[in-house]
From Swiss-Prot:
Main EC class the enzyme belongs to: ligase
Organism of provenance: Nitratidesulfovibrio vulgaris (strain ATCC 29579 / DSM 644 / CCUG 34227 / NCIMB 8303 / VKM B-1760 / Hildenborough)
Keyword Zinc: yes
Protein name: Isoleucine--tRNA ligase
Keyword field: Aminoacyl-tRNA synthetase, ATP-binding, Cytoplasm, Ligase, Metal-binding, Nucleotide-binding, Protein biosynthesis, Zinc
Catalyzed chemical reaction(s): tRNA(Ile) + L-isoleucine + ATP = L-isoleucyl-tRNA(Ile) + AMP + diphosphate
Entry similarity comment: Belongs to the class-I aminoacyl-tRNA synthetase family. IleS type 1 subfamily.
Compartments, record wording: Cytoplasm
Amino acid sequence: MSDYKKTLQLPETKFPMKANLTQREPEMLRKWEKDDAYGAMVRASGQQGTYVLHDGPPYANGNIHMGHALNKILKDIIVKSRNLQGFKAEYVPGWDCHGLPIELKVEHELGEKKRTMPAHAVRKRCRQYAEKYLDIQRKEFKRLGVFGAWDKPYVTMHPSYEAATARELGNFAAKGGLVRSKKPIYWCCSCQTALAEAEVEYHDHTSPSVHVRFPLRDPRVAEVLPGVDPAHAYIVIWTTTPWTLPDNMAVAVHPDFDYVVVRHGGDFHIVAEGLLEACLKAFKWDEHEVVARIGGRALEGLKATHPFYDRPSPIVLADYVTLESGTGCVHTAPGHGREDYETGLRYGLDIYSPLTDEGRYLDCVEFFAGMTIFEANPKVIEKLREVGNLLAEGRITHSYPHCWRCKKPVIFRATTQWFIAMERNDLRQKALDAIRDDVRWIPSWGQERIHNMIEFRPDWCISRQRMWGVPIVALLCEDCGEAWNDADWMRDIAERFAKHATGCDYWYETDLSDIVPAGLRCPKCGGDHWKKETDILDVWFDSGTSFAAVVEQREECGFPADLYLEGSDQHRGWFHSSLLASIGTRGVPPYRSVLTHGYVVDGDGRKMSKSVGNVVAPQEIIDKHGAEVLRLWVASVDYREDIRISEEILNRLVDAYRRIRNTCRYLLGNISDLTPETMVPFEAMDPLDRFALDLASRAHERIQDAYTEYEFHKVFHTLHNLCVTDLSAFYLDILKDRLYSSAADSHARRSAQTALYRILMLMVRDMAPVLSFTAEEVFGYVPAALRPDVISVFALPATDAPAFTLDTTSRAAWEKLLAVRSETTKAIEPLRKSGEVGHSLDTHVTLFADPSLKATLEGLGSDLRAMFIVSRLEVMDLADAPADAWTSEELPELKVTVRKAEGEKCERCWIISADLGTDAAHPTLCPRCTAVLTGTGA
């Protein structure tokens, strides 16, 4: 027996079957670094213009987590795909370095020493801490295969950035949008600082619940409510914050609600009629009598008395009073609530909030001096009981604001702060108009979400009572407390920040005399004793001005950015602050499109939590599977929802990755001897090869459209389907015989090889943004004669992706053939199951087709026998089909007969032939194989 295996053109490539990603990826990272693959990518693009994805800066604190990995990989996919499409898309990574988390870490490290250290010394420690984690995170992001200007990031603590932030504050001042006033704001007693809306999280919290009556001794009660004795009249409120009762200044009722006077014993109590039943149940009053009804508007101006202080609490009107819970009469403390504050301004009430920064009552607060607010809660209830004004007491679990950093409950507290005014210069309306008209929101529900947040948000509190951040550039009069913040002066100070080695440390290190303009006098009192403002800017203002510090300043960027991409929580964070900062100073949004992704959750959809023990770290996945599998995970899911990750999910992706890799390996193996000179033009290719290229080209178009529309799960599924269904299960399966058995330089084989090369180059381009490591590895194994002369797969010019597509008629004919092939497989199956045949090559198939189908099959111009992978195939008229022919339910125009092929199996190609041994030198070969070996045929 001859060894004919050596005469076959078997696949040949050094591209390894086993990925070994954990070992090979670091090698590829070093290669990219050495070759400046990122620079090469950017230099090769630009034919289609520019594209700016502006990076939302992660916080420089701790190692990266799965949310970071998801975010950075998504951005990397976009940047790489845009460059490969011909857009010059550079990526400038950023870091957010100021703020409370770092300051608290440093505070913990320093302990008591911090109290005696100058501000600039503490700030130096904060800077060192941020630099440490910036470097750690940079290494971790690069390990993910993310391309970017890693040696030239933007950093919010760099002098140029701090100067830009201070300059933007000056721009707000110039337009009148920066104001200083006393208002209730979120306050964290633990961190001892004001908080922005974006720094508040809502968690369930159990609070005391009390119904309290306010004596209504006003003589006018008898006029408004005849028959009601003022000496025994009360108005009833309900609150879950008893500690705010010492600061009560009024009771609010709704002007359009009906209220009732309920007699119980000898006393009269006013509550809303719509809440009467709930109140009676809470008070546990079995016996009562409704003695009067009155509209809320008629109660305005009556003077109630505070339940335990000798001072009035007038009845006022407010539209925010509801009938959802309580009594319909609302305890009003203007120093502790936003709506209360607005009501207080309208009625001239005292904005009273006698608390220290740590949440203790001042000494002036009778009964509760020195107590924290939470210590005071039971004491206030005790006092109410003592004076006889507590009607009911209980506990309630409700959603309550907590500090994002320390996770402790926060309070509303009126303090003097700096604000960006939402109504000045029409900031709110301009922002709402921009949200509707100028920005594309992906997903579309993002528009409504941020619109609602902007529409109802209060003025933006931008001051923080901390040290690590950009100082609010202002002077305070020591004689009267008035603030001075001339816009030109503020911008001049900002320029000094830019020139100072450590930026805005200038504010802390420079003598007051060098900062205060000569001869400056207070515009309010005429005094000339000044001090520097010690408050710093909200870090959301810091990061929100990145468009001014980066997008407008870096030559590789351009304002406005094409895309901001972050997690869905950033509608209240970076998207929000950036929009207000840009609209407030430029009148336009800083972005054209905003894309949001969901949160990473475990395989059961649960939020990741250390206490639950379900946290998955990116490094764990990289160490086990490689970053490539993590990248594939990002591309495989619809990231606009919450994204699940588990070992089971990753194992499925490992299998999918293996199929894609094996397809690439097979393609590489079969083009090893192809050269540009031996390639076949598209028009001259075998029709099957043209169809395969059409399939790949259409997949390529769908993939490129998916990249453009940010639908990366479609990229993955299209690529995977191309490999598994169109190639492995169809085209490559058919092609093996032609590739292996044909003469090496035959037209049939060269046509197939050309198609495989074209398909591979399309695939490599389509894979590269997602499977970056593998695409580069595959590209490196493309035969040198065929490989484009570029240093990296990412430097392929956009013009190198021609489309090889068929016309609609030709495509329809091939799709019909696929349907016939599928039906024929069904017809063969009974013989395979019975053991009569082992493989489709053991069969002789006859297709009985109506005239239209027969013409379609015969008109394809390709070897039908090869496409059906049988040893013999005939096409006959449907009318000639025997009665026992297999009938297709899907194609009524088709019937099939299958029988065992006659003859013997060719030792070289395994096709069964009745004509073996036509050449005595090769008695076990079919005529085709004999012709190949003797050089007389293909």
